[in-house]
Amino acid sequence: MNLYEKEMSSILFDLVDKHGVVGVKTSFEDEGASFNEVVRLKETANQSGTKLYIKIGGPEAKRDIKDAMVIGTKGIIAPMVESPYGLEKFVKSVESIVYDNESLQSLDLAINIETITSVKNLDEILQSDVVNKLYGITIGRVDLVGSMGIDRSQINSETVYKTVSESFYKIKKAGLRAMMGGGVDIHSKSFVERLHKEGLLDKIETRYVMFELAKCLSDFDNNLSKAQKFELTWLTNKNKMYSYMANHEKSRIDMIQGRLLSER
């Protein structure tokens, strides 16, 4: 591990030990994480005593599922599930790869509800024969408000709250864990607290960090700030790594160009 990764481990260990963090999350989908990046995050999670969760590129992204299992993920999340069929494709795809029943039982499967179409079809999704294979459902607010034609600045509005809370009520009634991501920052505190008081929310997610809600709320602003520091350190690490690689290739490019010019 390099210095940045050691700092990440230190931040994450503190978050796990004292602030309710229950996992690190990364994504082959919207984030476009590479296999090597996910391996490094997995090592950081291991060093900090927590688990890694991976969002795959789609409900039937079998290559991503295979990579996630090789890396050793605790959970797999399918994005943009908008119908019972999408849910069924996801579950069947996982089951076609994770053939060992014990491994399958220990794997947390979740889907993202993140469009207004998903919300409208939620009743049907929850009535699917395979919904009992899920650990939980995450509502992704950024894509949700975009699909509703609402500006992101209104993500904590009453209109969005009504849509989210009604969806979580159905999710909890189905016996699933209710999780929320998308625009989770210090400005969403009252939004999160309302859901918690109504018994509708179990976990929240920043881009990379997953919190168990009850413990997180005890020092919400500080906990979210620490999660942002973890993300900043990781992004700085990636920036340094890829800058080094680019500079290394640039020196090779310059050398080859020099050779070609000398041959003229």
Model-derived features: positions:
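Expand to "…catalyze enediolate/carbanion chemistry for C-C bond making/breaking, isomerization
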Residues: 1-264
